[in-house]
């Protein structure tokens, strides 16, 4: 945690201040002072490193990947008195994170100081953001003055766990695509990659002692269209979609992430979400006669509302089957040997217990172990898994359902069903990662559903930006940090994944790094727009949904449909039409709620800034808008 030094910085820099001329840094640093003047990078840049910097060669490689490849600047290692870019190791104040850094730029050059290699690395990420967006280009940029503003920046993270979860089970992402994901994370000072490696739709990691897990569980029939509406697979159809990571792939990803100061958290999701495992070992459910297949995207789970759900197929491991624990011991032995991180995530979420209630084996287990209900049955399972994981020298983490029926000793809780579970777990002195779906589920809609790819729920950028990883009521001593989750049921491609992730991942990055008092929505929006330019250069996809209007619909005078609109981003003008023609800035501007005129069947709206279109043209049929009226 960042302590006293930060509060002094608030007094120096002001809270939530932002000048248009200041560099657009995300996440916003604790303290940043700018002065007149800039340092232009020379054609030959001399660099020096303090003795003891362990990853000097990697830092040189990183500098070369942009400065030499993109800017054409040659690099030369020299003594510090000849260097225009110096990397120095310092002693960290007791109140500061070892990930802290200081960055100074003046007429003599650039100085990056930090108590650790991680801090030096984060200083470099800030350095890149001080350069023009063209530094992110994929090819050489000529005739550019690569200048950096004179500044003094002091920075440190708010929390230690700054995570993103990537679901590689529902849709598979290749090793190289995961590396790109890691690069994008690192650029915004994330330091935990949570890999959701297993689910009903795929088993994505090699377990050498259990080859059937990937031979059977990693592949399914290929489908195109809307997830949840696919037809059921024929057992005989070719299983052409899927893939998995070999253990050598995992080692390569771990090394790649570690160079960028990112730890990888593996998740093996049990006892529910286990259909891919059961396709390989069907006798491990409480309904062993089921003809299991890896799920291909057809709907078998149902959520009727009120937080309740049920399944058409038993996709759970059976807590009463001793062979389950033997198999899990084998799996976690190999997982623990692969991943250096202290935690292993065992899932524990969305276990439909109706199948257990019908099982004679479960009834015998309850009688033998004096278990009162199905929550205690799940707790029995979780505690046994916790002991298996502990026997491998690791700590267990799970989604907040692992609290049901009694929390296992020492277990970490990832709080996704709001903040309540995480707050309660922290008061019980259990480590907590805050990941509430109401702020951090970046697979939800981020704009009007009529303009977005199909998904569910709603999480607009501004709401994401309100995320506080240490919510009121939590014991901050036990809150490790926070993370965003990118579930991939509906994400068929990397471009779609990027669209859902950015810019909401900017918002979470700032929420987990920057002091709460430094966050400012209007400033954040301005900075995002600069980072959109950086992403354009890098070829990274992103969503511009924040520019689109937010609509609410109601009935007035019994039958007339009234539409109210507002913007998420300030200083936009909304223009609209009912005449089947796209509205330009000469069409009526929205000022107050509008009523569909008689005979009109479609509303068209678009946002403008300074007379130029900035949002998407939204085509809103009356029939669709009527569906939003609450009766």
Where are these regions (language model features)?
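Short, compositionally stereotyped local motifs that mark structural "simplifiers"
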Residues: 25-38, 48, 515, 519-631
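Contiguous, structured surface segment used for ligand recognition
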Residues: 20-159, 496, 511-538
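Flexible loop/turn segments at secondary-structure boundaries
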Residues: 55-56, 172-174, 200-206, 271-277, ...
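Active-site neighborhood of glycoside hydrolase catalytic domains
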Residues: 305-411, 416-427
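Flexible, acidic glycine-rich loops studded with aromatic residues
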Residues: 395-411, 417-562
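Feature activates predominantly on carbohydrate-active enzymes
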Residues: 94-326, 330-343, 384, 388, ...
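Bacterial Sec-dependent N-terminal signal peptides
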Residues: 1-24
